[in-house]
């Protein structure tokens, strides 16, 4: 995890520039997320520079936006103008929040780059309310085009911490197996480099 965090610390200042090429993808994600988080208490894990949190905070009750990288959080705080949005450095495997604290948990483009995604899901389940919603879009690198595979190769050479190369169905199966719940609001958002980008709202049942 230290190497993982160091990669993002080194690249925090470049992150927003890097993400601009996927602006259309993210605009679609904001559009899909806003109705789900309206008037809700939200936790975002792996917020990076806070792109998603800043674009949806207006409709929420409040957002706790967290990341393991201090440099990413420093970048996020620079552009924060909302009293409803709080940024902090946290470990997604060991969160300081009480159980059943949040209506919605967002973990975007992160489960494929952490070494133990199942451990993160256990912690998410702990802090999510019984009728809460998990929103977990991620890149499905097994479906990359040739261009996407070449790009991913050079990103790995630069230290990008890719751990899981799921297909869309493998990712869905991973979530179902670990969470044992039904999914609602499942959408697939095409991604420019040829990787699937899947938005999942997972309703957690009372018996889960």
Question: Across the structure, where does each feature detected by a protein language model lie?
Answer:
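Short alpha-helix
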Residues: 161-179
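Conserved class I S-adenosyl-L-methionine
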Residues: 133-162
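A conserved beta-strand element that flanks and buttresses the S-adenosyl-L-methionine
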Residues: 106
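Short catalytic micro-motifs in class I SAM-dependent methyltransferases
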Residues: 109-110
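A short glycine-rich, Lys/Arg-flanked "PGG" loop and its adjoining helix->strand segment in the class I
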Residues: 118-130
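Conserved alpha-helix/loop element of class I SAM-dependent methyltransferases that forms part
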Residues: 21-40
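N-terminal, positively charged/glycine-rich alpha-helical extensions of SAM-dependent methyltransferases
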Residues: 1-13
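Class I SAM-dependent methyltransferase SAM/SAH-binding core
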Residues: 43, 47-94
């Amino acid at each position: 995890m230290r190497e993982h965090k160091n990669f993002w610390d080194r690249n925090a200042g470049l992150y927003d520039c890097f993400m601009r090429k996927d602006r259309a993808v993210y605009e679609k994600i904001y559009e899909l997320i806003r109705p789900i988080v309206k008037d809700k208490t939200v936790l975002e894990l792996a917020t990076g520079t806070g792109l998603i949190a800043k674009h949806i905070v207006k409709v929420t009750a409040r957002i706790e936006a967290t990341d393991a990288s201090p440099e990413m959080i420093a970048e996020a705080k620079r552009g924060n103008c909302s009293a409803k949005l709080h940024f902090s450095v946290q470990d997604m495997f060991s969160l300081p929040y009480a159980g059943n604290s949040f209506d919605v948990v967002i973990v975007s483009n992160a489960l494929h780059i952490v070494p133990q995604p199942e451990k993160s899901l256990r912690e998410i389940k702990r802090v999510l309310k019984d009728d809460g919603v998990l929103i977990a879009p991620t890149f499905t690198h097994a479906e990359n085009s040739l261009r996407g595979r070449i790009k991913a190769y050079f990103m790995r050479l630069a230290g990008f911490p890719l751990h899981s190369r799921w297909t869309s169905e493998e990712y869905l199966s991973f979530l179902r197996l670990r969470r044992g719940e039904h999914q609602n609001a499942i959408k697939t958002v095409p991604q420019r480099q040829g990787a699937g980008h899947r938005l999942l709202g997972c309703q957690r049942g009372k018996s889960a």
